């Protein structure tokens, strides 16, 4: 039993609670809310538009025990500190906790931590503040906006395209960016151009180099082979000479420390992590991980930020670490980076909480992903405070008549920050020339040969997850806290598909985008969406009322909905079949993707003349708990669905439980749920996690099936599935036989039978409710 005078501190997750509890001592009891406890229920719109857009919040289903536990703890506590994350979402969680626990205004103590370290936690507890209602209102405005758009637009898509689709205020714009880029690629007309290189030798001295054609003497583009040939004709048999040598020093400055968007981009480039995975691992590093001899330690600062600000203490610590580890030459003075226009400066940039915790010192305490991301954050921050990298650059100009060729080479003079870190790039890096001989102006040269190459201009590259994050940031679409969820959502909805790290729209995505462009130009407008983000920022700053933002938005949106319903009254849009690369084994046509009530499959487009079909491998949400690869849905020969790692026998993971798009709030691994009737809410299947749910508590008793260890090959899985089917058939037959006698008795009792028949409509209600739940619209950013 906690001491009656203990203070209660409420955070979101158990790992954060554990870390903070270590720093506060026995006078404080730290509990976790496990995220949101109160929200708009999914079953209805839950926004009273007629009464000033009043939200109708309710406690979340499945959180009753947590709420009861927090209420019990609150009754016997001293002060109650609400210590959720330092952003809009965290402020809203605290606001809902205040309501659920019935905490008076004058007894509300809100505390935030930019980093979870002893000094920061203890200092914050000593200086609590009231809940910032402006932050809460900005979150409410965003939540209600997304609910209205999602719940009113999605049913229109169901009626006009297909069931189960969704639209959202930000996800629709992100989809548009991908579709627009694809249209640019399709419309692109390649332009021919040529390059001409010459291999030059020094006259009477060792040393040669390659130079590139520049012009005659002004810069000239070679657009055809005829252009190249005219240059070659002019050069034939003529001498070359060095007309210019320029030597200079070039410096490169380090990139600033990470903000949310740049962390997601760099983790995608260097670590091959999705934005969603990056944020999940970063959350673990922020909230605390077990470090040998230290207990639970928060390793990085808060990871949802667009600020480049760094505290003076952190700057000093970085300088000390650089001087001691790399030497005084690698550190000159603190670098203070200017914030971008429109950036919110409430938090610092993303950095290590304690730079003295070198990545290699904590590697054995972290998972592979945690270590790689921590090392990336640590290296980027330290590099941001190091001296410039210096290069010696030599540029040579050689001429033959009026035709000029150039060659450039750079060599490193001082490594500076590049000793530990260099920023990744989305585009291909330029090929560097070979070292150049020590030439002097006027020196004679001879041409040893020419190399002409034909090229064509390339279309704009498809977005990667990293470059889409950058585009959303540059255009003002979404906020740092939403990028990862939005990019995951448009892929989960199958509006966008990722192939070889490149994002392209699906046929479905293009049809939905076309309808949105035609009927909802504001919702799909990049400028409109960016302006809405600015209005939410104004609400946060206390410059606008949140309900006035909703009212202004809804007036135009409602009219667009009315117009769209009328214009599309007799319209049904068809989604073209996705054409696969696989060929029909009978007639040779490219198979197309079809959907039945059992899921997707490949079929010949020549139906009914050709009836060839083939099962398709479906990619599931989440990641393999053993190796982190994708999880695929497979079927046995008897049609039973099971889920296995895409690496097959190389990994060996297999389960009958269904992967979900939810991650465990404690360990971060993918959560699963039982298939079929009797399934409970998603559970954690990681036996090393404190949130692990044992086999016997996962919803219903399962028959004996192939275990994960025994299922390293598909044949094992199929054999188990067939055995399970046989058991099911035997059980079904037994039930049927057992039901005969009661059925005969019921037939003999006609009045009783009538009474049962009269109750049938009532019996259908749960089924109707279940069916309705399957077609609920979804918000832009569901919790």
List the predicted regions and their residue ranges:
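Intrinsically disordered, low-complexity regulatory segments
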Residues: 1-143, 152, 214-215, 219, ...
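Basic, low-complexity terminal or inter-domain segments flanking catalytic cores
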Residues: 2-8, 19, 154, 187, ...
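Conserved short loop/turn motifs at secondary-structure junctions
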Residues: 5, 85-86, 162-166, 247-256, ...
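Alpha-helical scaffold elements adjacent to nucleotide-binding pockets in ATP/GTP-utilizing enzyme cores
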Residues: 19-23, 69, 92-100, 120-124, ...
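C-terminal or mid-to-C-terminal helical accessory/interaction module adjacent to the motor/catalytic core
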Residues: 116-198, 248
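Core structural elements
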Residues: 142-152, 170, 200-202, 250-262, ...
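Short acidic, hydrophobic short linear motifs in intrinsically disordered regions
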Residues: 242-245, 254-267, 294-303, 459-471
């Amino acid at each position: 039993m906690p001491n009656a005078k203990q203070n209660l501190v409420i955070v979101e997750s158990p790992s954060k609670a554990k870390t903070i509890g270590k720093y506060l001592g026995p006078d404080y009891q730290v509990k976790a809310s496990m995220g949101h406890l109160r929200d708009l229920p999914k079953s209805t719109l839950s926004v009273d538009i007629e009464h000033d857009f009043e939200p109708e919040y309710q406690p979340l289903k499945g959180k009753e025990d947590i709420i009861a536990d927090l209420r019990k703890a609150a009754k016997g506590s001293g002060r109650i500190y609400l210590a959720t994350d330092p952003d809009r979402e965290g402020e809203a969680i605290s606001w809902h906790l205040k309501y659920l626990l019935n905490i008076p205004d004058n007894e509300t103590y809100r505390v935030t931590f930019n980093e979870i370290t002893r000094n920061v936690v203890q200092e914050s507890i000593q200086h609590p503040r009231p809940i910032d209602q402006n932050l809460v209102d900005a979150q409410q405005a965003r939540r209600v906006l997304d609910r209205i758009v999602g719940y009113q637009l999605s049913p229109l898509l169901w009626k006009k395209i297909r069931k189960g689709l969704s639209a959202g205020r930000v996800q629709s714009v992100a989809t548009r960016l991908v579709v627009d880029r694809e249209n640019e690629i399709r419309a692109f007309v390649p332009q021919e151009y040529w390059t001409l290189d010459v291999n030059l030798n020094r006259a009477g001295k060792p040393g040669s180099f390659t130079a590139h054609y520049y012009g005659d003497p002004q810069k000239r583009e070679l657009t055809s082979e005829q252009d190249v040939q005219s240059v070659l004709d002019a050069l034939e048999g003529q001498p070359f000479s060095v007309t210019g040598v320029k030597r200079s020093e070039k410096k490169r400055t380090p990139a600033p420390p990470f903000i949310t968007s740049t962390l997601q981009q760099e983790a995608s480039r260097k670590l091959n992590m999705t934005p969603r995975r990056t944020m999940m691992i970063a959350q673990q590093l922020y909230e605390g991980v077990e470090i040998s001899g230290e207990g639970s330690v928060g390793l990085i600062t808060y990871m949802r930020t667009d600020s480049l600000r760094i505290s003076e203490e952190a700057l000093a610590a970085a300088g000390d670490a650089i001087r001691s580890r790399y030497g005084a030459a690698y550190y000159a003075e603190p670098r203070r980076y200017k914030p971008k226009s429109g950036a919110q400066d409430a938090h610092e940039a993303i950095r290590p909480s304690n730079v003295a915790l070198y990545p290699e010192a904590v590697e054995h305490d972290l998972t592979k992903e945690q270590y790689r991301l921590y090392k990336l954050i640590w290296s980027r921050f330290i590099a941001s405070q190091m001296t410039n990298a210096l290069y010696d650059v030599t540029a040579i100009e050689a001429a033959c008549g009026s035709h000029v060729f150039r060659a450039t080479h750079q060599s490193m003079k001082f490594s500076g920050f590049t000793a530990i870190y260099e920023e990744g790039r989305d585009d291909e890096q330029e090929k560097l020339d070979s070292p150049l001989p020590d030439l002097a102006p006027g020196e004679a040269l001879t041409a040893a040969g020419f190399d002409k190459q034909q090229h064509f201009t390339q279309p704009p590259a498809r977005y990667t997850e990293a470059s889409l994050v950058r585009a959303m940031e540059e255009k003002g679409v979404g906020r740092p806290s939403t990028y990862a969820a939005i990019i995951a959502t448009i892929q989960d909805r199958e509006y966008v598909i990722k192939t070889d790290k490149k994002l392209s729209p699906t046929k479905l995505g293009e049809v939905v985008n076309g309808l949105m462009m035609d009927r909802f130009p504001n919702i799909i407008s990049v400028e409109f969406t960016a302006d809405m983000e600015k209005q939410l920022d104004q609400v946060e700053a206390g410059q606008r009322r949140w309900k006035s933002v909703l009212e202004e938005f809804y007036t135009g949106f409602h009219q667009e909905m009315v117009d769209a319903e009328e214009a599309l009254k007799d319209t049904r849009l068809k989604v073209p079949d996705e054409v696969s690369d696989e060929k029909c084994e009978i007639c040779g046509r490219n198979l197309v993707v079809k959907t039945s009530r059992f899921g997707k499959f490949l079929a010949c487009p020549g139906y009914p003349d050709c009836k060839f079909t083939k099962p398709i491998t479906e990619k599931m949400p989440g990641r393999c708990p053993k190796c982190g690869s994708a999880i695929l849905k497979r079927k046995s020969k008897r049609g039973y669905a099971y889920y296995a790692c895409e690496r097959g026998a190389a990994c060996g993971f297999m389960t009958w439980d269904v992967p979900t798009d939810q991650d465990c709030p404690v360990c971060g691994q993918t959560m699963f749920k039982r298939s079929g009737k009797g399934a409970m809410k998603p559970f954690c299947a990681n036996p090393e996690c404190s949130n692990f749910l044992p086999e016997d508590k996962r919803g219903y008793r399962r028959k004996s099936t192939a275990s994960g260890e025994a299922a390293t090959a598909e044949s094992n899985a199929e054999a188990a599935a067939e055995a399970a089917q046989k058991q099911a058939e035997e059980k079904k037959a037994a039930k049927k036989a057992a039901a005969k006698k009661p059925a005969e008795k019921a037939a003999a009792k006609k009045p009783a039978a009538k009474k049962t028949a009269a109750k049938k409509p009532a019996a259908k209600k749960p089924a109707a409710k279940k069916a309705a739940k399957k077609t609920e619209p979804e918000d832009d950013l569901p919790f």
